[in-house]
Amino acid sequence: MAAEDPPVSGVSGRYATALFELARDEKSVDAVKADLDKFNALLDESADLKRLVRSPVFGADVQLKALNAVLDKAGIAGVAANVLRVLTANRRLFAVADVIRAFNALVAKYKGEATADVTVAEPLSDKNLDALKASLKTVTGKDVALNVKVDPAIIGGLVVKLGSRMIDSSLRTKLNSIKHAMKEAG
């Protein structure tokens, strides 16, 4: 599947494709996705972990020791943990967020889903997430996996990116539109 029409490219795409094919062969796609999503959440929450991953100052041995401690504490093991260790050993840990994003795109394609990037001002309830998924499903005709990012800078509302389409109903955008309209009028 991945060799026919890869939806990902570059270094992160190669790692994601290899990881996806391994997970698919071992019938552990969902488990690997859950572990990678857990690691991605840890990355979003911890400035120290983000610094460790992105900074070229830390050597591979230091990164590997710290990564192993994080993986043990988070309960991440198996294929997902191994690919994170390989990224570290190959000095590619800085690309982990892109690898996870590319892997999730491959999983969505494999499952016949579309993936939407959603930016919200504050976390959505499960009820609101389900309603958003249902709305996007009526538009696309496919199940939609959501990558939700919280960004208080949008003030309110949400921004949805689905493929080449973008729906921006954020309060920040509406306020900017009013601001520009007032500048033109006065």
Swiss-Prot record:
Classification via PROSITE patterns: ATPASE_DELTA (PS00389)
Subcellular location: Cell inner membrane
One GO molecular-function entry: proton-transporting ATP synthase activity, rotational mechanism
Main subcellular location: membrane
GO cellular component: plasma membrane; proton-transporting ATP synthase complex
Membrane topology annotation: Peripheral membrane protein
Keywords, in A-Z order: ATP synthesis, Cell inner membrane, Cell membrane, CF(1), Hydrogen ion transport, Ion transport, Membrane, Transport
SUPFAM superfamilies, alphabetized: N-terminal domain of the delta subunit of the F1F0-ATP synthase
Quaternary structure and partners: F-type ATPases have 2 components, F(1) - the catalytic core - and F(0) - the membrane proton channel. F(1) has five subunits: alpha(3), beta(3), gamma(1), delta(1), epsilon(1). CF(0) has four main subunits: a(1), b(1), b'(1) and c(10-14). The alpha and beta chains form an alternating ring which encloses part of the gamma chain. F(1) is attached to F(0) by a central stalk formed by the gamma and epsilon chains, while a peripheral stalk is formed by the delta, b and b' chains.
Entry's family note: Belongs to the ATPase delta chain family.
Function: F(1)F(0) ATP synthase produces ATP from ADP in the presence of a proton or sodium gradient. F-type ATPases consist of two structural domains, F(1) containing the extramembraneous catalytic core and F(0) containing the membrane proton channel, linked together by a central stalk and a peripheral stalk. During catalysis, ATP synthesis in the catalytic domain of F(1) is coupled via a rotary mechanism of the central stalk subunits to proton translocation.
Protein name: ATP synthase subunit delta
Organism: Bradyrhizobium sp. (strain BTAi1 / ATCC BAA-1182)
Highest classification ranks of the organism: Bacteria, Pseudomonadati, Pseudomonadota, Alphaproteobacteria, Hyphomicrobiales
